[in-house]
């Protein structure tokens, strides 16, 4: 090599001088070829990847041209350099080969750089990471040659001037290109800048500066947040996961089947003695209960596949993060060696000063590279965690769309939402830190290795301590996992009950049952908090053990080292190098509790997710969809069941339905009509046979499913808007009159579950949704059950019937309305799941079979209201068109009113009655005028019309009052106690460092000899005592903080629950359930787990930094001056960051709520979504919502990295400044001081970073307290109990007086009751009628004070209801509501949640409610389990249970709020009979839905526009020939004087 350069290649003597330098030959060869070799090694891979991508070429930019121009300049300079070498090589002057070689290498390299830069422009507008590294390497390696040439020019100005100047210019261009690569070219305004960011911008996260600046200037909104990269979007990551999951789950299922086959070889026990052939209707409750117990004992399901699938999906990111963490971990161990060199440098008077500066610079460089690697690693890990959460959430949603009904019944909506919210988050948290497991092993192993080098075999004593503690940690970890499993179950139970409470809150308020359900929730919460305390205690013990481990190891190791051999002296180099290594050891050991806890929690979640995602899908193989077939629907020996353990519900059905036919399906209650529909939709388990369907299907369920959105959106249901078709559907479904009344018309927002629509309106919207779809087959499951007879007739004629909108389509029409049957093509009569008869209407009557007998019975008992037909209008007029008792309608809607009035006018005119004609014309004109006024009022914007308000998002800093609220919940004395012991922990830490420094100085003072064994023992004893004091103080402070924070969680949850239950009904009408549930799930979970952990970490970091800075300033007082600018930089970064991070966390919380609400809505409407085959549309909407949330999460993750890299730079500067000052002042310092300062300074980088992280985490997590406080501060309804309490037997008589009573729903809205004045005497039966918006339901709500008075009084038995407590009022009244809502729990709990009544009284109530035989037939009787929403009972049985509640309470005042609107004739008759018998001496107020049910009332109240327009006996009102007369006339009963039915 010497000949190659014509100079010395390497000479160590050059370094042994105050002005050290490297040989020029070394600089011109090795330091030139290193960067060039790096480029040539990686460039081919780059060019090949571009060639493979074949991406569309990007446009040429000025930025790209500038880089290419500078490279061309370098190319020219290389050519000039080669030319100079050739020119100089003349005569006797010999130019060394290196002068030819380097220019040629540079020429080739610059051409390669041009090609690579061009390829990057072709691929994407992003600087190549390895080009950036090449320029950095080139500039760094060039520094040495640069300074050598400068020195040479200063010594001899004429030596190699041309070459030197060419090098300087070339070096300058390389610096310019390095600077250019630090910037990115222009990017798309909507695309995240991370895609096009340069390498330097990527590793420093400078591309995020704009967002941070924007967040500091004003609170961020969703529009300010960048969209995430396509590769991170839900569809992209989920598609990769599904490809892996399909294979892994298949293998897991095969293994599961093998396990199942083995277990089935054993004798099978029957399920609680149940016979498979027991009646399904009688024993469904027993089966539910037995299956739940069975599920608890079995844990068999496809296992151990989810982690494999996730690894296959994200293995590239995992590998990248692995490499980055490995580099970081290896670099960590360079700092102790550099520290050792610096201590030796200070102690040695012969060391050259440049050596100290080199050590300081290297220490800074190493820590800087560590920071870049660590933060890039964390970015990869956290983004990986985000993608894992995205994948899991999307997969859960997709699974919900395909899950079989049997599998779905194992999960309540609350439990499934928990999988999406809690379990996916646990998996994300574990993914963030999972690589710390192997990293900890490497760090611990390398720490022990280097400690062995310092202290020899003595370290084995320390290792022994660690090994002894491993089993203890294992036992604690197992116990923690078991507690976590139990706590997740408790959370599921609590959220399940909360979902039910929120769904049935109106019932709870009517019956004053809030305390009972509050007690249930608090009971589960008590168990949860007990487990949380145990979890915290074990975690504290684990933290104590892992924190004290390095202290014990250091004490034991140092003690053994000095005790085994008197020659072993603990000097500064050994002690502080070892302490630095112990500090490195401390990090993995301190992180292991969190990582272990996170992984254990995640393992529980993985089990739960594997069970759900591995569940059976809906088996649609029995439903064969064909395109060319002569039948629309064909049942071939089809048998279906809801549960394989039960006999078939639909048995051996053979049925052919031709295209275009209208087929009616009839039968008694429980005959299998709805099951037949479900079988066609593929919702049941196939036993044998199959169903063939030709074409698409549309479905209208018996219980309407309405989405939270506008009426228009619900009708269109994702289809394209067609004005003509849309108007036809609205008219046919009788929705136009309703749209005229509703604010906003068809753009009126429907609340959750259609809360602001009547039952009839919801059903007609549901029918309109189906009618708008251009389907081939329409499956209508009793769609007219919730509308009155005249609207039903209109809908049948205009939509379903032979001349309706759907004429020509295949219609399968399940109905109780026998009067429609003459119009259908074929009638199918079902009984016990089989077809009893089928044929045309006339054929079945002629057969004189089951159908003919039922028809005869119907005609005998139907009365005047049963004679209506639907053949044509004229026949209807002649026959006195009336209400049919079998119709289950709700006539309080505008369509009903409009049609009644129109029909009334038509009939009156046809009979030529002048007086009636005049009234009819006047009525018609008044109706027209009213409609005009309504349309005018629609144009006015009325504040408060919007029902569901957008979720409020706080902006700016979290108010100090929120912190105070949480600290107050924690307890001020507890806070002082915790701070005291954290402070004492840090004092003990400082003391142990100072003591160790004094100990190491003994070796210098005693010239390597030990003073005495007692002195040595004293040093060991005090050092050990200080270490033990650290551990004890930490344990006490941690335990106390866990106890105090648990009390805070208990208080906040208690306040939230109490206030939510006391919130007025209007709060629940305007707030989606998902939004409230989010407070009880995500926010409470944060307060339980994350916030206490964050506060503990913050205090440890704060005291740690304070102690470290104090120690550094004690050693080098000059450092106090440097602290000032570093503190300013530190605080500035924190201020910028916290403003952004805080708002991003809020946006994250707010954007989660729609995901959970939409999911709950989807699960509820699954049969409809599947029937319409809209799974993909719903899946796309879910993916869109998740992506909106994910962009907030990604931005928050990046903000943490942006902060961390800048804070670590501050920490690195602290290390560098400390090392620099120690080099400068080395003559006044000793080795122990240097070791003392630097060992603590090296520790400060992570601690500074962690402090701001914890500061931000504290503020972002305190947002959970802010959100909880928002609902804690929601305005309450009136007190439940006041000092003024009514007599125990009140109301004794049941007399009710309304005195000029007025009410409005919200302060900004108009009055809905306008001066109601009437007197209802004791024992009177009053029927209330009126149109939608007349005020009937409002009257009921006022009686129970669901709505509070805006003026006037309601007096019951002489007591103003406003003067007593709500529960004193509501407990003395009884209501049977329209919607029969039940809660999960026992039948007895649903009847008597407070256990006020004896079993005999409960059984008597069941007997009077006609349910005794049913309940006594159940194995568990009153203790039989009711599932969520009462889904395992029929609607009729649910309504009879509600009747049982009323009978059990038997108040003097009973309100029937359309109690029989949604039940069949049989149930209606049972309810009416019991009420007339049991409540004969009570005051009964009935809101009418069928006129025949109130014709025997003592008085009739007719409401219109919030006023009483008529009030009197039925005879009196009929003789007045007013509005009630017209309604009765329409029903064909105006001549009935006092009908007893």
From Swiss-Prot:
Q: Which residues carry this modification: Phosphoserine?
A: 279, 281, 874, 922, 926, 1434
* Annotated residues for binding of ATP 1: 667-674
> What is the protein's membrane topology class?
Multi-pass membrane protein
Q: Would you tell me the Gene Ontology cellular component terms?
A: apical plasma membrane; brush border membrane; cell surface; intercellular canaliculus; intracellular canaliculus; membrane; plasma membrane
| Residue ranges, Extracellular side | 1-26, 89-92, 147-164, 331-356, 455-457, 562-583, 989-1029, 1115, 1229-1230
Molecular functions per Gene Ontology: ABC-type glutathione S-conjugate transporter activity; ABC-type xenobiotic transporter activity; ATP binding; ATP hydrolysis activity; ATPase-coupled transmembrane transporter activity; bilirubin transmembrane transporter activity; organic anion transmembrane transporter activity; protein domain specific binding
In what residue span(s) does the ABC transmembrane type-1 domain sit? 318-601, 975-1260
Under the heading PROSITE patterns, the entry gives: ABC_TM1F (PS50929), ABC_TRANSPORTER_1 (PS00211), ABC_TRANSPORTER_2 (PS50893)
| Catalyses which reaction(s) | an S-substituted glutathione(in) + ATP + H2O = an S-substituted glutathione(out) + ADP + phosphate + H(+); taurolithocholate 3-sulfate(in) + ATP + H2O = taurolithocholate 3-sulfate(out) + ADP + phosphate + H(+); ATP + H2O + xenobioticSide 1 = ADP + phosphate + xenobioticSide 2; 17beta-estradiol 17-O-(beta-D-glucuronate)(in) + ATP + H2O = 17beta-estradiol 17-O-(beta-D-glucuronate)(out) + ADP + phosphate + H(+)
* Compositionally biased spans, kind Low complexity: 906-915
Q: Which family does it belong to?
A: Belongs to the ABC transporter superfamily. ABCC family. Conjugate transporter (TC 3.A.1.208) subfamily.
Can you say what this protein is called? ATP-binding cassette sub-family C member 2
Gene designation? Abcc2
């Amino acid at each position: 090599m010497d000949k190659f350069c014509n100079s010395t290649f390497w000479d160590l003597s050059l370094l042994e001088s105050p002005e050290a330098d490297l040989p020029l030959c070394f600089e011109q060869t090795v330091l030139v070829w290193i960067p060039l070799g790096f480029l040539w090694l990686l460039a081919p891979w780059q060019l090949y990847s571009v060639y493979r991508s074949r991406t569309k070429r990007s446009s040429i930019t000025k930025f790209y041209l500038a880089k290419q121009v500078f490279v061309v300049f370098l190319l020219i300079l290389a050519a000039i350099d080669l030319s100079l070498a050739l020119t100089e090589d003349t005569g006797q002057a010999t130019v060394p080969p290196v002068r030819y070689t380097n220019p040629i290498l540079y020429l080739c390299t610059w051409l390669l750089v041009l090609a690579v830069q061009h390829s990057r422009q072709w691929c994407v507008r992003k600087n190549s990471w390895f080009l950036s590294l090449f320029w950095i390497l080139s500039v760094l390696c060039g520094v040495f040659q640069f300074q050598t040439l400068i020195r040479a020019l200063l010594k001899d100005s004429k030596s190699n001037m041309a070459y030197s100047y060419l090098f300087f210019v070339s070096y300058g261009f390389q610096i310019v290109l390095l600077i250019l690569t630090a910037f990115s070219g222009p990017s798309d305004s909507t695309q995240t800048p991370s895609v096009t960011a340069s390498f330097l911008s990527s590793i420093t996260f400078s591309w995020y500066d704009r967002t941070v600046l924007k967040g500091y200037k004003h609170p961020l909104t969703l529009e300010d947040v960048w969209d995430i990269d396509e590769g991170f979007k839900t569809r992209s990551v989920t598609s990769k996961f599904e490809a892996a999951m399909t294979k892994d789950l298949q293998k897991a299922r095969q293994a599961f089947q093998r396990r199942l086959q083995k277990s089935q070889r054993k004798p099978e026990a029957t399920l609680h003695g149940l016979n498979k052939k027991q009646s399904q209707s009688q024993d469904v409750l027993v089966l539910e209960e037995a299956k739940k117990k069975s599920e608890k004992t079995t844990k068999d399901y496809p296992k151990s596949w989810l982690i494999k699938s996730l690894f296959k999906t994200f293995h590239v990111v995992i590998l990248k993060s692995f490499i980055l963490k490995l580099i970081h971990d290896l670099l960590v161990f360079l700092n102790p060696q550099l520290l050792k060199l610096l201590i030796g440098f200070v102690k040695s008077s012969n060391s050259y000063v440049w050596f100290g500066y080199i050590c300081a610079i290297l220490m800074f460089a190493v820590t800087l590279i560590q920071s870049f690697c660590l933060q890039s690693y964390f970015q990869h890990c956290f983004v990986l965690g985000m993608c894992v959460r995205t994948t899991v959430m999307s997969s859960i949603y997709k699974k919900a769309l395909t899950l079989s009904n049997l599998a779905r019944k194992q999960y309540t909506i609350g439990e499934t939402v928990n999988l999406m919210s809690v379990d996916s988050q646990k998996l994300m948290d574990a993914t963030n830190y999972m690589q710390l497991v192997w990293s900890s092993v490497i760090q611990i192993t390398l720490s022990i290795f280097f400690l062995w080098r310092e202290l020899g075999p003595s370290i084995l004593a320390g290792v022994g301590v660690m090994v002894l503690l491993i089993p203890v940690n294992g036992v604690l970890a197992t116990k923690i996992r078991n507690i976590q499993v139990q706590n997740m179950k408790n959370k599921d139970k609590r959220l399940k009950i909360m979902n039910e409470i929120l769904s049935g809150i109106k019932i709870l308020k009517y019956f004053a049952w809030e305390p009972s359900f509050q007690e249930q929730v608090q009971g589960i919460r008590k168990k949860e908090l007990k487990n949380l305390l145990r979890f915290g205690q074990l975690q504290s013990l684990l933290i104590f053990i892992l924190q004290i481990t390095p202290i014990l190891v250091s004490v034991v190791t140092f003690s053994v080292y000095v005790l085994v051999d008197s020659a072993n002296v603990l000097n500064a180099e050994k002690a502080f190098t070892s302490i630095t290594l112990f500090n490195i050891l401390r990090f993995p050991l301190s992180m292991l509790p969190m990582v272990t806890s996170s992984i254990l929690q995640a393992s529980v979640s993985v089990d739960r997710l594997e069970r759900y995602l591995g569940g059976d899908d809906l088996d649609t193989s029995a439903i064969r969809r064909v395109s060319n077939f002569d039948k629309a629907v064909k049942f071939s020996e089809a048998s279906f069941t809801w549960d394989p353990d039960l006999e078939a519900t639909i048995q051996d059905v053979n049925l052919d339905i031709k295209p275009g036919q209208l087929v009616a399906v009839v039968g008694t209650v429980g005959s299998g009509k709805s099951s037949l529909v479900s079988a066609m939709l593929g919702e049941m388990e196939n036993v044998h046979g199959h169903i063939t369907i030709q074409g698409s299907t549309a479905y209208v369920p018996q219980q309407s499913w309405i989405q939270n959105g506008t009426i228009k959106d619900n009708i269109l249901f994702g289809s394209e808007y067609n004005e003509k078709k849309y108007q036809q559907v609205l008219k046919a479904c009788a929705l136009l009159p309703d749209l005229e009344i509703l604010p906003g018309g068809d753009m009126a927002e429907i609340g959750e579950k259609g809360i602001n629509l009547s039952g009839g309106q919801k059903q007609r919207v549901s029918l309109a949704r189906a009618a708008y779809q251009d389907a081939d087959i329409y499956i209508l499951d009793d769609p007219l059950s919730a509308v009155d007879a005249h609207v039903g007739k209109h809908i049948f004629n205009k939509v379903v019937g032979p001349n309706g909108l759907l004429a020509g389509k295949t219609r399968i029409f399940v109905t109780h309305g026998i009067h429609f049957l003459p119009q259908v093509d074929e009638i199918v009569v079902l009984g016990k799941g089989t077809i009893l008869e089928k044929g045309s209407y006339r054929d079945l009557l002629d057969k004189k079979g089951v159908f003919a007998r039922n028809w005869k019975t119907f005609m005998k008992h139907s009365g005047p209201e049963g004679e209506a037909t639907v053949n044509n209008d004229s026949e209807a007029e002649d026959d006195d068109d009336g209400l049919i008792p079998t119709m289950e309608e709700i006539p309080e809607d505008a369509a009903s009113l409009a049609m009644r009035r129109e029909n009334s006018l038509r009939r009156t005119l046809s009979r030529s009655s002048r007086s009636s004609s005049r009234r009819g014309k006047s009525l018609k004109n008044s109706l027209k005028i009213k409609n005009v006024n309504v349309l005018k009022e629609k144009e006015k914007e009325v504040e408060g019309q919007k029902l569901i308000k957008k979720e409020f998002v706080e902006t700016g800093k979290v108010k100090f009052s929120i912190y105070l609220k949480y600290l107050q919940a924690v307890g001020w004395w507890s806070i002082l106690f915790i701070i005291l012991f954290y402070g004492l922990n840090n004092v003990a830490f400082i003391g142990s460092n100072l003591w160790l420094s004094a100990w190491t100085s003994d070796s210098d003072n005693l010239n390597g000899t030990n003073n005495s064994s007692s002195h040595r023992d004293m040093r060991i004893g005090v050092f050990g005592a200080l270490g033990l004091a650290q551990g004890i103080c930490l344990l006490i402070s941690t335990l106390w903080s866990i106890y105090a924070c648990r009390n805070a969680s208990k208080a906040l949850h208690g306040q939230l629950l109490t206030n939510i239950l006391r919130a007025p009904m209007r709060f629940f009408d305007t707030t989606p359930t998902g939004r409230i549930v989010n407070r009880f799930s995500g926010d409470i979970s944060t307060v339980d787990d994350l916030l206490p952990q964050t506060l503990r970490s913050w205090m440890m970091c704060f005291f740690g930094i304070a102690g470290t800075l104090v120690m550094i300033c004690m050693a080098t007082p000059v450092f106090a001056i440097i602290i000032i600018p570093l503190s300013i930089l530190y605080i500035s970064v924190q201020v910028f960051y916290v403003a952004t991070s805080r708002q991003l966390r809020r946006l994250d919380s707010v954007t989660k709520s729609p995901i959970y609400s939409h999911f709950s809505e989807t699960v509820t409407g699954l049969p409809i979504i599947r029937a319409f085959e809209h799974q993909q549309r719903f899946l796309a909407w879910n993916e869109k919502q998740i992506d909106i949330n994910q962009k907030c999460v990604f931005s928050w993750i990046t903000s943490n990295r942006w902060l961390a890299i800048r804070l670590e730079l501050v920490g690195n500067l602290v290390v560098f400044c400390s090392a620099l000052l120690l080099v400068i002042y080395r003559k006044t310092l000793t080795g122990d001081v240097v070791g003392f300062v630097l060992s603590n300074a090296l520790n400060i980088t992570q601690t500074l970073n962690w402090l701001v992280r914890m500061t931000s985490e504290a503020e972002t997590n305190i947002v959970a307290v802010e959100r909880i406080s928002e609902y804690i501060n929601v305005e309450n309804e009136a007190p439940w109990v006041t000092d003024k309490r009514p007599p125990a037997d009140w109301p004794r008589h049941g007399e009710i007086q309304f005195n000029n009573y007025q009410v409005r729903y919200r302060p900004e809205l108009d009055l809905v009751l306008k001066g109601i004045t009437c007197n209802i005497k004791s024992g009177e039966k009053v029927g209330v009628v009126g149109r939608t918006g007349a005020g009937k339901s409002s009257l009921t709500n006022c009686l129970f004070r669901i709505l509070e008075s805006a003026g006037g009084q309601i007096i019951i038995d002489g007591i103003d209801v406003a003067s007593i407590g709500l529960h004193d009022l509501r407990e003395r009244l009884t209501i049977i509501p329209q919607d029969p809502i039940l809660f999960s729990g026992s039948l007895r709990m649903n009847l008597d949640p407070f256990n006020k009544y004896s079993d005999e009284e409960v059984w008597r109530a069941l007997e009077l409610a006609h349910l005794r035989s049913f309940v006594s037939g159940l194995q568990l009787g009153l203790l039989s389990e009711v599932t969520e929403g009462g889904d395992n009972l029929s609607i009729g049985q649910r309504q009879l249970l509600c009747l049982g509640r009323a009978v059990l309470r038997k108040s003097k005042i009973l309100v029937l709020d359309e109690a029989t609107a949604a039940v069949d004739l049989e149930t209606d008759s049972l309810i009416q009979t019991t009420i007339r018998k049991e409540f004969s001496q009570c005051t009964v107020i009935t809101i009418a839905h069928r006129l025949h049910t109130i014709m025997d009332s003592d008085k009739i109240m007719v409401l219109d526009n919030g006023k009483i327009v008529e009030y009197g006996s039925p005879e009196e009102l009929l003789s007045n020939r007013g509005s009630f007369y017209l309604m009765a006339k329409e029903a064909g009963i105006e001549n009935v004087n006092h009908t007893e039915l």
